[in-house]
Amino acid sequence: MKTTSEIRQSFLDFFNSKGHTVVPSSALVPENDPTLLFTNAGMNQFKDVFLGLEKRPYTRATTAQRCVRAGGKHNDLENVGYTARHHTFFEMMGNFSFGDYFKHDAIQFAWEFLTSEKWLHLPKEKLYVTVYETDDEAYDIWHKTVGVPSEHIIRIGDNKGVPYASDNFWAMGDTGPCGPCTEIFYDHGESFWGGLPGTAEEDGDRYIEVWNIVFMQFNRQADGTLAKLPKPSVDTGMGLERMTAVMQHVNSNYETDIFQTLIKEVATLLHVADLDNKSLRVIADHIRACSYLIVDGVIPSNEGRGYVLRRIIRRAVRHGNLLGAKEAFFYKLVPTLAKVMGQAGEILTDKQSYIQKTLKTEEEQFARTLERGLALLEEALTKVENQTLSGEVAFKLYDTYGFPLDLTADVCRERDIVIDEASFEIEMTAQRERAKSSSNFGADYNSVIKVEAETAFIGYDCFNAEAKVIALFSNGQAVDKVQSGESAVVVLDKTPFYAEMGGQVGDSGLITTAFCQFAVADTQKYGQVFGHIGQVVSGSLAIGDIISAQVDIARRQAITANHSATHLLHSALRQVLGEHVVQKGSLVSENVLRFDFSQSQAVSKAQLEEIERIVNRQIRQNLAVTIETMDIETAKEKGTVALFGEKYGDVVRVVGMTDFSIELCGGTHVKHTGEIGLFKLISESAVAAGIRRVEALTAENAINWLHNQQKIIHQSAELLKTDSLSLVDKIYQLQDKIKRNEKELQHFKDKLAAQAGAELAKQVVQINGINVVIQKLEGIESKSLRTMVDDLKNQLSSVIVVFGSVSADKVNLIVGVTKDLSNKVNAGELVGLIAQQVGGKGGGRPDMAMAGGTEPQHLDTALAFAKQWIHSKL
């Protein structure tokens, strides 16, 4: 029986023997295609080749492409684990012809691979094919050339309401390349329900599509008509998981070798005996998607691809919770996955530690809110009407407890409950509007500035130029002229001003004529033109005026030094922290540089010092900074660092600082690194889960910061009546003194608490003959509460004590039970239940337990609940 890895390799070997170049899988984050959330088909990396925008050195290719369908238009997430064949991650085997062979060879190749004794050797009588209704050519090849009997060939017409809309007609979009396709189905046998393609029972598990062969032979025009392509092409896809199920004689993909290995590993970790449990299938699927997304540069976050990853991780964690997981477990599956994936798992092995760290951090973070969120959901589900959960509850789970909507839907699905998604969207829209109204963005000139021209940027090598005013905008509309005192956006035919891009802020400076002075505060790019934003200081400016544009040189040089420093910083971060570091954002201004990057753990002080040393070493070496333009493929071969999600053209600008740093960049840079002067890191912090931020200063700003730090040290030493060298010792002495004073203060507090305890003993009530004291207190800290409880237990010998104290907007809870009563009332259990009422948690021994909370407004209700609960136990 062939393994998944063997089937994958057989496919590549077969097509390689037919003259196809084996092309590695592209990343799950599509390169140069911001329209696509994730790579979801084998043809994605060849899209520009099919469109004629890119040429490759081969006309035949074959791949084993990793794909994700979760989020966006292609979203299988909610079905994963509940069906035999839905996955978030899958591998698509493909063979492609770029104007080379066409229908005859494509069909022959597929049939030979499937049925030849040398390859998969499937029984021919088990295979059925579909063709587009009018594609007589494909029908004849299958019937007359290959020899498939007519009863095994099914014509499928337009079945989606419009012409050329069919399961057997493929299109790249509303216009562009399209054509008929032929699909191959495998018959799993009469023991499975289902009918042939085109019948009412086609969605059953008997006849399963295993291969789709698309014939790109037309170009759909805007009017819907089809024109023949001069060079027809072929795009095919064979689902590896489905074919493995066929070859291993099982009907469900989850019964194949890779999934069974993962399912058994999860079952072992969580001590689950039932290997058919749906949650095991969910987790086995999700570890594949999460691991490969992380290795391809995605990190958990609250937006875009990162949020899809977060949703998948949290769904897996919730299913682990259903199976009884008490601690982080998901990350432990990575080594098993890397091993079982064979050659496709090698990239996981290389970054195994990073993948596990990322998963564990996210898993532990969600675990903190999972239990409380599930409790809220369980309570809400008991109150639903018409089997519908309100969108308000779903939104609260999303907004407060981090529950993605599909995770809430997952729980509801198990109770046959649906979510009112319309009211959920109303809540989401309201939140977006709140965020929008609280932002500081001004007028959106992108919708206003529409100029049928292009501004030529000439500012890499000069700071001033003569140019022509080609457009003016003021108060959100186009104007012909602006006067003194008016704010405006000036568009020039050429400019030395750099417009904000790639994290680098826009230039400022002056635009002047003999009769006008216009102060430029910022420069932005609107489409293909540069907008110089500012105010007329004197005179007037009109369209057609010839002006002198002068950049603020000192400011530009400071910005430039900071931009070059970010490149050195990026390389130093990768050296010290690891190759997983990827830039996630930046700000390069004249005053500071800010750099966001992928990293799950905080950067230690020692690591920050090493990073700073490395950058300053490169500055002292005064490295030459080279700038070259080259095609994108050559840049990749040089090891150039590019940014995920950025779209690059065929020709790119490469900024190099010897071999220490090579990056694609359109910004301005120093000629030699020595011009940066000095580099000083001033902060490190978290921006979001999995993203850290550092801020740094260079040149004069760095020197001024160091002078200020030195001033603070001297002033502190003077205040403490010591010198700078003895300052730390002096602080240690003061800390010791404070500790002694605090200890003495606590002693007095305990005395006062004991006196208060004596008074509280008078507040005892009887519940079924048992002494009970339940009191709300003010300003008593947890240590003193414990003393008070101990005193009461000593005084009354048999008692149940519950205290809730509000101190500094927080709730301190304590439950004490004398040992003779702890078999009836468990202090740890009771304090945990009370804590839930005040937004907290806690626990402890049967005779003494403590907890905290963040919702003091609910303390009265919580104490009333405690009284009722005690009554029920006694």
UniProtKB/Swiss-Prot annotation:
CC terms in the record's Gene Ontology section: cytosol
Record-linked Pfam families: DHHA1, tRNA-synt_2c, tRNA_SAD
Spell out the PROSITE patterns in the cross-references.
Answer: AA_TRNA_LIGASE_II_ALA
Residues annotated to bind Zn(2+): H563, H567, C665, H669
Q: Which cofactors are reported in the record for this sequence?
A: Zn(2+)
Q: Which InterPro entries match?
A: aa-tRNA-synth_II/BPL/LPL, Ala-tRNA-lgiase_IIc, Ala-tRNA-ligase_IIc_anticod-bd, Ala-tRNA-synth_IIc_core, Ala-tRNA-synth_IIc_N, Ala-tRNA_ligase, Ala_tRNA_ligase_euk/bac, DHHA1_dom
What's in the keyword line of the UniProt record? Aminoacyl-tRNA synthetase, ATP-binding, Cytoplasm, Ligase, Metal-binding, Nucleotide-binding, Protein biosynthesis, RNA-binding, tRNA-binding, Zinc
Give the main location: cytoplasm
Purpose of the protein: Catalyzes the attachment of alanine to tRNA(Ala) in a two-step reaction: alanine is first activated by ATP to form Ala-AMP and then transferred to the acceptor end of tRNA(Ala). Also edits incorrectly charged Ser-tRNA(Ala) and Gly-tRNA(Ala) via its editing domain.
Domain description: Consists of three domains; the N-terminal catalytic domain, the editing domain and the C-terminal C-Ala domain. The editing domain removes incorrectly charged amino acids, while the C-Ala domain, along with tRNA(Ala), serves as a bridge to cooperatively bring together the editing and aminoacylation centers thus stimulating deacylation of misacylated tRNAs.
Family label = Belongs to the class-II aminoacyl-tRNA synthetase family.
Q: What is this protein called?
A: Alanine--tRNA ligase
